[in-house]
């Protein structure tokens, strides 16, 4: 079904979901250029939308928002990156702080202008916030859980003016994956769990094309699945790095995934530009594309389960710009070129216990032939449905 009413704008750039909250930010969809689009934050909670359109107007360069993230230890705290205005910190829907070059190690695009271009964000296991800072010398910044900052230079990546570090992923082994889209690079950074000691850090460059069947030129998105594998959305389909704890000891290669469709074997979505990938509670992949709509892919990526586009569904547009999934309800939020949609999937995240177990309908009458929904289960639980006699 659709989420209505929705956010203040139909130009949705990024979506964050945590617990039962969803945060949506506006964006012009300009990937690297300045568009001066006013930023806004919209919150969906308790089946209602709330927003404060003028919340950012008193701050420097509150335009061209890029990403949004909840603090996993405090759902009332939200961080937002901006392609011009650094990083904003929001508490209880109020902007309380802006991080720029004057009050943090974040760097300006000097000498061209004093904009601070930030994009990707991710929290690590110690609740340190990792941020990509483009068009400057040190492309990686860390705001520690203590509030102190750290600035890190990445090898393999030129610090020339204009270089872009876009997205960052912190995986289950606490390694950081940073995308450098313009030069088609993917950097893996391991701080060896000694954040303040830069001398023991290990950095590797992922070889995106040598072991792949399709040569790609640009990385658009990156996500880790429930098996620890890294899925990479590119300009020509999807590639995967099969992750492991000793990954940093060997060369790292990305590979294509074979899928059999209509009797033919081909590389997964090799003709599509992949804009976003979301992993649901069943480890399936929801894949957004630039012009072909939305795909649901099996856990391994070898089977296409469903396809949604303007012709066969209520999808607003075949251009999918961003997605995220509510881990509690399983609702998939889809940002299209024509606005935001919500789709209720049939898979949510496993719970830590059975305290919120729900069955609908309950009781199930003998004449009922529809779907039975069971929610609030633990991961990998076995569910059996019987009649009163067992």
Residue ranges and their predicted role:
Residues 47-49, 92-97, 145-149, 189-199, ...:
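Short loop/turn segments immediately following beta-strands, especially the blade-tip
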Residues 237-239, 318-352:
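Blade-level signature of beta-propeller repeat domains, shared across WD40, Kelch, NHL, RCC1
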Residues 352-384:
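Glycine-centered coil/turn sites that cap beta-strands in beta-rich domains
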Residues 7-14, 62-68, 83-84, 110-122, ...:
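Signature of short aromatic-glycine-proline-rich micro-motifs recurring in repeat-based ectodomains
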Residues 17-20, 70-75, 123-126, 170-174, ...:
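Residue-level detector of Asp-centered blade-edge/turn motifs that repeat once per structural unit
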Residues 29-33, 85-87, 136-138, 183-185, ...:
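Short glycine/acidic-enriched loop and turn motifs that connect beta-strands
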Residues 1-8, 48-63, 94-114, 150-161, ...:
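Surface-exposed loop and turn segments in beta-propeller and other repeat-based domains
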Residues 21-25, 77-80, 88, 128-132, ...:
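Conserved beta-propeller blade signature
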């Amino acid at each position: 079904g659709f989420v209505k009413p929705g956010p203040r704008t139909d130009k949705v750039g990024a979506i964050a979901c945590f617990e039962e909250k969803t945060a949506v930010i506006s964006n012009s969809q300009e990937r690297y250029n300045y568009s001066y689009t006013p930023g806004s934050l919209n919150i969906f909670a308790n089946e209602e939308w709330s927003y404060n359109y003028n919340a950012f107007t008193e701050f420097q360069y509150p335009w061209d928002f890029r990403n949004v993230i909840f603090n996993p230890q405090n759902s009332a705290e939200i961080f937002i990156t901006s392609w011009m205005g650094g990083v904003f910190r929001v508490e209880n829907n109020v902007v309380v702080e802006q991080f720029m070059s004057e009050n943090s190690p974040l760097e300006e695009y000097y000498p061209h202008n004093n904009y601070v271009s930030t994009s990707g964000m991710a929290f690590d296991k110690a609740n340190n916030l990792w941020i990509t800072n483009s068009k400057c010398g040190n492309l990686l910044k860390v705001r520690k859980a203590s509030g102190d900052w750290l600035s890190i230079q990445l090898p393999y990546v030129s610090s020339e003016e204009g270089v872009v570090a876009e997205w960052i992923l912190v995986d289950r082994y606490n390694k950081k994956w940073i995308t450098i889209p313009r030069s088609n690079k993917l950097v893996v950074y391991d701080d060896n769990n000694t954040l303040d000691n830069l001398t023991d850090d290990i950095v590797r460059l992922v070889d995106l094309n040598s072991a792949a069947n399709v040569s790609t030129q640009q990385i658009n998105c990156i996500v880790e699945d429930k098996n620890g594998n890294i899925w990479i959305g590119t300009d020509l389909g999807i590639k995967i790095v099969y992750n492991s704890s000793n990954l940093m000891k060997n060369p790292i290669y990305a590979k294509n995934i074979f899928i059999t469709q209509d009797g033919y074997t081909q590389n997964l979505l090799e003709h599509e530009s992949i804009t976003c990938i979301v992993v649901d509670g069943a480890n399936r992949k929801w894949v957004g594309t630039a012009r072909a709509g939305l795909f649901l892919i099996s856990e391994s990526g070898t089977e296409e389960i469903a396809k949604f586009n303007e012709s066969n569904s209520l999808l607003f547009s075949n251009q999918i710009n961003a997605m995220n999934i509510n881990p509690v309800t399983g609702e998939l939020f889809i940002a299209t070129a024509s606005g935001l949609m919500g789709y209720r999937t049939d898979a949510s995240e496993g719970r830590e216990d059975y305290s919120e177990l729900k069955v609908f309908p309950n009781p199930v009458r003998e004449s009922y032939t529809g779907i039975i929904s069971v929610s609030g289960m633990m991961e990998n639980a076995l569910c059996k449905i019987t009649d009163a006699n067992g």
